């Protein structure tokens, strides 16, 4: 007796969700596998990229364009503010491109309950990944218990989907960067991420290298903020980044193709 999935939409949706989860887990297994930039192809570089649009004045038309670029170039994901998650999920339906939503963006200063609610809403709307901003004030005050509890709440609310924690490296001392990376690993999140791109600075090679040294070889490290050209993207990967967040994704991949064609 055969089961007709087309007559069982609930089962079909469950199967789709399962395959998305498996795909996400598979990507995490390779989170620490940094490619050799000398042999990196444009397609492989595209698979590092969260194609990002987080401007306050982004319109529905801008989001459509973002998704079209992601489909064409096969970027790993599209990263947007929470209000656009549903539209992005619809635009990317039938593709392998994931949907990522920011939470607590860009300051990270709202309550933990608010971040939890925002995370749950994003997952309900179809997000496959969450990029949450850390509460920097609590971290700087030495309230590690608060920071860890808040991050664990977000991880729980994400319901096993990967969580990336934005630590805003430009506002931290070296010691704080090390401490917060350790907290992120302990929280159950899957990535530590450099920056929002909305503060006083973005990703640096030195910060990415320090983050990689702190979290170890198998944990995800995402570089974001100020990555606008191919050489910067490659430098971040060489330093240990396993994901890149950028709005200049198309130019970055095109730049690598041009470098390869020039020999």
Regions from the PLM with identified roles:
Residues 2, 11, 20-31:
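Short, positively charged and aromatic/hydrophobic N-terminal segments
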Residues 12-18, 42:
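Short N-terminal alpha-helical targeting/association segments
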Residues 255-262:
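Short, charged, intrinsically disordered terminal tails
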Residues 29-43:
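Short, compositionally biased "basic patch" segments
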Residues 80:
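N-terminal beta-strand-loop-alpha-helix module at the start
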Residues 224:
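Short hydrophobic "strand-cap" motifs at the C-terminus of beta-strands
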Residues 39-73, 83-105, 111-221, 229-250, ...:
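Alpha/beta enzyme core
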């Amino acid at each position: 007796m055969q089961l007709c999935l087309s007559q069982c939409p609930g089962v079909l949706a469950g199967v789709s969700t399962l395959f998305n989860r498996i795909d996400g887990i598979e990507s995490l297994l390779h989170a620490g596998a940094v490619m050799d930039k000398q042999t990196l192809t444009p397609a492989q570089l595209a698979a590092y990229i969260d194609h990002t649009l987080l401007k306050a004045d982004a319109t529905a038309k801008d989001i459509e364009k973002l998704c079209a670029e992601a489909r064409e170039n096969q970027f790993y994901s599209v990263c947007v503010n929470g209000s656009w998650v549903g539209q992005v999920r619809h635009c990317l339906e039938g593709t392998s491109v994931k949907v990522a939503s920011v939470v607590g963006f860009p300051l990270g200063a709202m309550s933990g309950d608010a971040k939890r609610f925002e995370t749950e809403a994003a997952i309900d709307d179809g997000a496959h990944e969450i990029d949450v901003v850390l509460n920097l004030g609590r971290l700087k005050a030495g309230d590690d218990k608060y920071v860890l509890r808040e991050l664990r709440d977000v991880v729980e609310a994400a319901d096993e989907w990967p969580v990336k924690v934005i630590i805003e490296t430009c506002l931290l001392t070296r010691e704080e960067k090390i401490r917060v990376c350790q907290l992120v690993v302990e929280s159950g999140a899957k990535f530590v991420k450099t920056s929002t791109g909305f503060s006083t600075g973005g990703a640096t090679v030195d910060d990415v290298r320090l983050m990689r040294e702190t979290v170890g070889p198998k944990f995800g490290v995402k570089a974001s903020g100020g990555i606008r050209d191919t050489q910067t993207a490659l430098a971040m990967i060489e330093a240990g980044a396993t994901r890149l967040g950028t709005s200049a994704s198309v130019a970055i991949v095109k730049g690598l193709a041009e470098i390869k064609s020039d020999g």
